[in-house]
Amino acid sequence: MSVADDILNDLHGGIANTLDDLRRELASVRTGRASLHLLDGVRVDYYGTSTPLNQVATLSVPEARLIMVKPWEKNLIPVIEKAIRDANLGVNPQSDKDLVRVPIPPLTEERRKEIVKQVKHKGEDHKVAIRNQRRDAKELIEVAEKDGDIAADDAKKALDKMQKETDEGVKKVDEIVAAKEKEVMQV
């Protein structure tokens, strides 16, 4: 494998990681429907240790606008309820005798537009990350060419492949963002 191939493989892996990161970030964006990803960032004080909610309770979505949290220990119910409330997710958890219900209120049109702006902003941030990776890879190719590790023709081919890879990555970011926008704006 040549130096150019190594650099292109690193770029490909970096772009894939950036796309995965964007998907993960957008999964936790509220859409007006119940999604377990909404509670991903919630941590509970479990015997003095900050523990992710999904490690102390069973989470489920029985209805489109309801998340149910069934703790494995009943004494955690008030702690879980407080943690969800303190997470500033725009939801109001309600505790029962053995579980916590988290009803998801419908989003207003104004709030939907705000969320779409946030989604677009995250998409732009990830496009910039992809372009920065291309810039770094381009610099590596140019240095390798200058040092004589890569022939000029191979460097040109590698730069063309890098541009294609970058364009595909940016296009995928646009597709992911468009799908999330559609999901958020759906009533």
From Swiss-Prot:
Keyword Cytoplasm in annotation: yes
Pfam families xref list: RRF
InterPro entries (UniProt xref): Ribosome_recyc_fac (IPR002661), Ribosome_recyc_fac_dom (IPR023584), RRF_sf (IPR036191)
Subcellular location: Cytoplasm
Primary location group: cytoplasm
Transmembrane segments: none
Record keywords: Cytoplasm, Protein biosynthesis
Matching CDD domains: RRF
Gene Ontology CC entries for this record: cytosol
GO biological process, one term: cytoplasmic translational termination
GO molecular function annotations of the record: ribosomal large subunit binding
Signal peptide interval: none
Family: Belongs to the RRF family.
Function description: Responsible for the release of ribosomes from messenger RNA at the termination of protein biosynthesis. May increase the efficiency of translation by recycling ribosomes from one round of translation to another.
Protein name: Ribosome-recycling factor
